[in-house]
Amino acid sequence: MLITNPALLGILASLVPLALGAPNQPIQARSRKCVIPSSYASSHGTADDSPAVASAFAQCAENSVIVFQEGVDYNIFHPIKATNLSNVEIRVLGNLHLPQDITAVQNIVKSGQSTWFTFQGPRVDWTGADDIKNGWINSYGQAWWDANPANSSSFPNRPHLMSYKTSQASIKNFRSRKPIAWNVKLQGDDITVSHAIVDATSTGGFPFNTDGFDVEGTNISITDSVMFNGDDAIAVNTPSHNIVFARNTIGYQSHGMSIGSLGKDPTDFANITNLRFEDVTVIDALYAARFKSWSGGRGLVKNVVWKNIRTFNVTFPIFVTQSYSDQSASRSGTIDPFSSVMMEDFTWSDFSGTINTYHPGDGSCVTDPCWYNVGLPNLKHTEAIVLECNTESSCKNFRTEGIRLHPQSKDSPSVICMKATAELNPKLGFECKNGTFVPH
């Protein structure tokens, strides 16, 4: 079953009163303020406010506060790029609207402007409205999803919503409604994200590639947020260290809390350590906890914990593959099938909930077999755990404990396990073989 919009709104409303935490103290006062004017109302929603927005970011690029006015609508018909920011607060108290003309947006992307908002610089804070009716970026992605050709996962020339590269910064009350595709590429150091909302629920076509946060950096936390989408809620990419994803609710047709994909380019050495995913509710998703790397990849991912994860109607609650495939991507060059992105010190602890037995999978399947079933023998959709290690030495010190996952059919939970050897994984918690899940 899928969560309806009223249910989603209930979850969103429940998060508003939660404490946001103390903001970072700026090194220097933000003594200048740029309040952005809007022509939306006077033009009956037809005028482009992008020039006024660009002007504000140019005038207030340092030690400033840039304000989208409370309850005011803004048309952002052209991409905004501000890469020279320093000690700036972006205060989004109104609502932003991307163009609804698909062809116009595609032409902009084809011209080389692939990201709609690009922000870069130290201490760049995003502060959305406390009022849940405001602070939204409206991308009108539903029309894009519905226009996607049958049996295709890649509608051409879709923009990324936002690239955000900063340090010593916070993002609070970020809200994205119907993103066309990817939401936020987040890069940097010492960044806290809290009370974010991504609503990519669809009434028609599947919302392909609507990732919540694609993360690359150090000391980054994402907490107290809701993401209902059609791809990873969070995807941790290389290099990344000390990442926390906690107290969040994710779902719709989500691809869960993911690491990767890694190793597609075997010359790109993966380097990821110290990740913690904790106290997360996962609803109606394809995956909950996922690791994905390509065979032939290189590198190391170490010290990863998923803990206290609650699943409701999830197809693959725990999923590891070191032989990932992407139905919309191809590889070039020589691939060594015995090379892997090494995994070491992984823990899955205190998982509880239900496995989607009756209607497994999601709308991202456009191939036969479905991309997410490739290489899995005799799927029953009672699998609590799927571990696909590429070689007998590529998975080390895996640990499971407190796994209480149950198929909706009330059959016994099962496991698919390949090459996670007992010698390298003495605390795995079950025998690595395909069949009924029997915890030790």
UniProtKB/Swiss-Prot annotation:
One of its GO terms (molecular function) is galacturan 1,4-alpha-galacturonidase activity. Its EC number is 3.2.1.67. Glycans are attached at residues 84, 151, 219, 271, 313, 434. Keywords: Cell wall biogenesis/degradation, Disulfide bond, Glycoprotein, Glycosidase, Hydrolase, Repeat, Secreted, Signal. The active site is at residues 231, 255. The keyword Heme does not apply. Pfam families: Glyco_hydro_28. It catalyses: [(1->4)-alpha-D-galacturonosyl](n) + H2O = alpha-D-galacturonate + [(1->4)-alpha-D-galacturonosyl](n-1). GO terms for biological process: cell wall organization; pectin catabolic process. PbH1 repeats lie at residues 188-210, 217-238, 240-261, 272-293. InterPro entries: Glyco_hydro_28, Pectin_lyas_fold, Pectin_lyase_fold/virulence. Disulfide bonds join 389-395. Residues 1-21 form the signal peptide. It is an enzyme of class 3 (hydrolase). It comes from the Eukaryota. GO terms for cellular component: extracellular region. It is found in: Secreted. Specific in hydrolyzing the terminal glycosidic bond of polygalacturonic acid and oligogalacturonates. Belongs to the glycosyl hydrolase 28 family. This is Probable exopolygalacturonase C. The gene is pgxC.
